[in-house]
Regions:
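Short, surface-exposed amphipathic charged segments that create phosphate/polyanion-binding patches used
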Residues: 17-20, 93-105
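Flexible glycine-/small-residue-rich
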Residues: 7-9, 22-25
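Acidic/histidine-rich catalytic cores and adjacent linkers
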Residues: 12-15, 25-27, 35, 52-77, ...
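Catalytic cores of nucleotide-enabled group-transfer and carboxylate-activating enzymes in metabolic
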Residues: 8, 81-82
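Structural motif
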Residues: 39-46
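Two-metal-ion RNase H-like nuclease active-site motif
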Residues: 1-12
Length: 258
């Protein structure tokens, strides 16, 4: 009653770059392998399967590739799309990294403009070290992107070559959060999802209740809307995450909204 859809890069020829892998979600056994994920290949294949068989599928597990999610509406009317947790956390981490990179780009631009200003005023080339923001975002953004359980925090201070003061891991983390408060919100949300998965992987009822509490906690956050809709529901009107079937519809967002 649950199948997984994914692609594998083969690049055998122009018509066989990404093959489509169909698996039994419970056993992991392959059901079939299609030479391409193109509609011209997948549509005739799925349509050829008797409707009585397709109607027995309750869950379609995939990444956030919208054409895969659309298979539910087109071929599996009794199923709900499910985004696997690996791709959810991958999307969250990538989104946070993109946000950090935009901050880094902004502060680098500030550095260049300030350096140009000094060079003009002094009528000679001026070279400046990176600003505190650029230094932190460039060298320590891993503190935000990594799972906290994988970070080895050290409390013993060490001399920092940029700030010329003794600092430990907690100091760098606090300094990053002072650059932009959103960074802490995003990191905390990521950690809530990681912990949610580790606690509730085998208990749908507990997962459903905690998910509701998580949503309640963050529903008033001005930064949470885009995260919530994509990270839980992958741009569909009523998809389900991790097979939880008691869900609430959410606003639909197009790709351009992100």
């Amino acid at each position: 009653d649950a199948i997984s859809i994914d692609e594998v890069h083969l690049d055998m020829d122009d018509d066989c770059k990404y093959a489509l892998v169909i698996q039994d979600f419970h056993t992991g056994d392959p059901i079939d392998l299609l030479r391409s994920r193109r509609t011209s290949v997948t549509e005739p294949y799925f349509v050829s399967i008797p409707a009585t068989e397709r109607n027995q599928v309750k869950y379609l597990i995939s990444d956030m590739y919208n054409p895969y999610i659309a298979y539910v509406e087109k071929y599996f009317p009794n199923a709900v799309p499910v985004v696997d947790s690996f791709h959810v956390i991958q999307w969250i981490t990538r989104s946070i990294d993109n946000y950090v990179r935009q901050l880094l780009k902004k502060y680098r631009q500030h550095d260049r403009e300030y350096q140009d200003k000094l060079s003009y005023e002094q009528q000679r080339p001026v070279s400046l070290p990176p600003s505190d923001e650029v230094y932190l975002l460039q060298k320590y953004r891993w503190l935000i992107l990594s799972n906290q359980s994988n970070i080895r925090y050290h409390s013993d201070p060490r001399m920092d070559s940029h700030f010329h003061v003794l600092m430990n891991t907690y100091d760098y983390e606090d300094a990053l959060f002072r650059i932009d408060p959103n960074l802490k919100d995003f990191r905390d949300l990521k950690e809530m999802y990681v912990q949610f998965n580790s606690r509730n992987g085998g208990n749908p009822l507990l997962a459903r209740n905690e998910l509701k509490e998580l949503i309640q906690t963050y529903k008033s956050s001005r930064n949470f809307e885009h995260f919530r809709n994509r990270f839980l529901f992958a741009t569909r009107q009523t998809p389900v995450l991790n097979g939880i079937t008691d869900y609430n519809p959410v606003a639909y967002y197009e790709e351009d909204d992100f």
